Amino acid sequence: MLICGENTNPLARYTLMAQGEQIHISSYPPVWPTRPASQAGGYDLEQAIRIRAGAHSFEAKVFNVVASACLDKAMLDRIADVLGRAVLADIEQAPRGVSVVIGPTGLPVSEVVSGEEKILYCDIDLAECVEPKQFHDVVGYYNRFDVFRLEVDRSSNRPVTFLAPPYREYGKEADRRPMTAADQARELETEGFHLIDA
């Protein structure tokens, strides 16, 4: 599953393809007004969704379940109350997101829903992903693994890493290695603090 603009990221999409996804889920907001309705060149959310969803389905040979949120009357009334009628007018005139299921050929295999809250039903057959992969399997035979490689780091990212002071001696030479919890405890104790287990 990728959210909104993440579906534009080819590395994220390829990572999912390489893990063998057969059904991709794309979620989008109900509307994305990037300019006032009076200005040309605004972002066409509906068209962008159709292009991205179709491209991913075709490249990955997967079904893509696209789910866009919906703005109901209560939300529109609240926007008008908080942000004003001018902002509401821009939102009402902006292209809406769409909900649809796209098949492995890149074409819709369900009805297209836009601007209303509705449950979308669609029967899919995963066997339909097989033949298209015989033509272009970009995570298999139809790739140049001798030239291209994608590396994904699944390690957890720490919110903070404490580094030792730059000239502190650890062994034979000065080292700016990350401080372990034990290093931090020793440093606190040398400064007169004592750690107590709770």
Located regions from the model:
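Short, charged/polar low-complexity linear motifs in solvent-exposed/disordered segments
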Residues: 17-18, 77-78, 83-84, 126-129, ...
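CN hydrolase (nitrilase-like) catalytic-core segments centered on the catalytic cysteine
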Residues: 4-120, 192, 196-197
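A short, polar/charged loop-to-alpha-helix boundary motif
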Residues: 116-136
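Cysteine/selenocysteine-centered motifs that mediate thiol-based redox chemistry or coordinate metal-sulfur cofactors
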Residues: 69, 129-198
